[in-house]
């Protein structure tokens, strides 16, 4: 894909982003736009013919007594306008805005059969969508269910503890992100991110995801977005198959593959493997095919829950509850100790979800609806795990990484009573000198896992290694110094958070093909090339571009 300006004068001149417009909470849109106009005027720019609109919005809560909203504004000049000097814009704290198109030059090599995309998470979805949009008629498969059936399976597990290992919080339409906060924030600097957001908006996501600096969709809305995207893939000539797990494949002399699936054999011209970070049997199958995989560092830990109103007050003080602020968010980290500790996937007004995908394990994750108005707020508190912490299994460090996760998940299952209840401990007990005992039952903050009905008091160190527990204690105390009250004794810890990222990477080359395996394209978070919805979607786009640039449409 070439991300080129539509016209030279557009790139250089016709639009600018005016940054750093700080206003009090409650300021009107008109006031924000007026400040942008004033900023342009101070640079000697005539604003009479310019069009101004809000571009990005963020909350600056570094000072609780003076919380500010910080905006960027897009200023656009009409046709025929002389435009803006980049030198002048730089002095103003502004920058040129480049209206970018997604332009892909198609290859000419014949594709011997339709492309197969394995996995319906963000990477697989966006890869299949772009392939379908460009006329390649992909086949998209997932081991799990369609959205509605998947929601029913997850609800059933929460209600009665019957786990469907093929359709759950990890597997099915939309991937693990379907049961999350639907965060779209990413740290990658790639112009494709804007294309991802715009596509999600067209598929039914709220329009404010374009404006917000920390956009989120919410699990309730994201489910509809995923279904709309799948429908669009079919409308564009693609095919979607559920309950279709990839168990193996054969390569043929003519360059085609036969994918061995639970729905039978599928002939394809290439395979995009976007399995998600929990497809452990897929990793093992790929190892058996002599593909090159490597273990990578991960993080493990717990979910911490506070009352949402407490967290709002901790971060926003007297401004807590203001409609311009919403439920408070945080991201905390400390790398000064023995291991890095950080919060991850913070879910304001959300719940802790039962995220197991294998029998006899307990895994936790977080989820919020669009409104973020639940009783509790939660986040992972995770500790860095090094590859040196893994013990090889059958001579494989990749299998050792998976075994490391499984040991913790199995320990959490046993600590919870072996009925898919979650082991919980108050922060007070965990930080106490007798942290190996869970003495105090939850009182002020109640666990939200499986509706709050299935939990058991158990010390965190029954689930996690001592070196992880020591780092968690260090991290909680550090975070409490940054956000007073974070380590309040009544807060609840639920174990175990183990699926923060993929424990392995499927090696690929500059052509995006797996090393030594032309025609197989590892993709997304499960392949080790992304972390989160937006970056996984971007990686799916990149892989689709690689396919499109190499082959002509079917």
Please provide the spans of the model-predicted regions:
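Residues forming the flavin
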Residues: 2-67, 74-554
């Amino acid at each position: 894909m070439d991300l080129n300006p539509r016209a030279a004068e557009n790139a250089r001149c016709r639009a600018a982003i005016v940054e750093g417009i700080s206003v009090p909470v409650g300021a009107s849109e008109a006031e924000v736009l007026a400040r942008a106009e004033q900023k342009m005027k101070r640079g000697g720019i005539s604003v009479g013919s310019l069009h101004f609109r809000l571009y990005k919005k963020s909350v600056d809560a570094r000072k609780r007594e003076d919380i500010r909203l910080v905006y960027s504004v897009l200023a656009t000049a009409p046709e025929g306008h002389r435009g803006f000097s980049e030198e002048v814009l730089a002095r103003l704290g502004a920058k040129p805005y480049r209206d970018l198109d997604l332009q892909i030059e198609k290859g000419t090599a014949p594709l011997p059969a339709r492309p197969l995309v394995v996995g319906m998470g963000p990477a697989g979805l966006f890869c299949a969508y772009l392939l379908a949009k460009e006329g390649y008629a992909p086949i998209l498969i997932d081991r799990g269910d369609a959205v509605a059936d998947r929601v029913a399976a997850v609800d059933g597990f929460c209600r009665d503890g019957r786990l469907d290992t093929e359709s759950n919080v990890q597997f099915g339409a939309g991937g693990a992100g379907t049961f999350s906060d639907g965060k779209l924030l990413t740290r990658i600097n790639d112009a494709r991110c804007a294309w991802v957001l715009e596509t999600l908006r067209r598929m039914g996501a709220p329009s404010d995801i374009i404006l917000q600096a920390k956009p989120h969709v919410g699990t309730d809305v994201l489910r509809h977005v995923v279904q709309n995207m799948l429908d669009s893939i079919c409308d564009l000539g693609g095919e979607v198959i559920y309950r279709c797990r990839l168990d193996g494949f054969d390569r043929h002399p003519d360059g085609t593959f036969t994918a061995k699936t639970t729905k039978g054999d599928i002939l394809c011209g290439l395979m995009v493997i976007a399995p998600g970070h929990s497809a452990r049997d897929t990793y093992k199958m790929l190892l058996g095919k002599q593909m090159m995989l490597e273990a990578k560092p991960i993080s493990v830990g717990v979910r911490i829950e506070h009352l949402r109103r407490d967290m709002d007050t901790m971060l926003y003080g007297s401004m807590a509850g203001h409609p311009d602020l919403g439920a408070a968010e945080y991201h905390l980290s400390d790398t000064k100790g023995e291991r890095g500790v950080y919060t991850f996937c913070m879910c304001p007004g959300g719940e802790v979800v039962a995220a197991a995908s294998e029998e006899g394990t307990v895994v936790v994750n977080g989820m919020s609806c669009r409104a973020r108005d639940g009783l509790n707020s939660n986040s992972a508190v995770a500790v860095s795990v090094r590859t040196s912490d893994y013990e090889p299994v059958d001579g494989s460090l990749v299998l050792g990484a998976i075994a490391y996760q499984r040991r913790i998940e199995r320990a959490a299952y046993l600590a919870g009573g072996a009925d898919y209840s979650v082991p919980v401990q108050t922060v007070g007990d965990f930080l106490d000198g007798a942290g190996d005992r869970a003495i105090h039952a939850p009182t002020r903050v109640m666990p939200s896992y499986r509706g709050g009905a299935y939990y058991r008091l158990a010390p965190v160190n029954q689930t996690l290694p001592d070196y992880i527990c020591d780092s968690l204690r260090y991290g909680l105390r550090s975070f409490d110094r940054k956000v007073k009250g974070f380590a309040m004794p009544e807060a609840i810890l639920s174990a175990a958070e183990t699926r923060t990222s993929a424990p392995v990477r499927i090696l690929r080359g500059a052509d995006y093909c797996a090393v030594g395996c032309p025609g197989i394209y590892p993709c997304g978070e499960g392949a080790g090339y992304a972390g989160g919805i937006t970056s996984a979607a971007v990686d799916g786009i990149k892989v689709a571009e690689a396919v499109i640039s190499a082959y002509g449409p079917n």
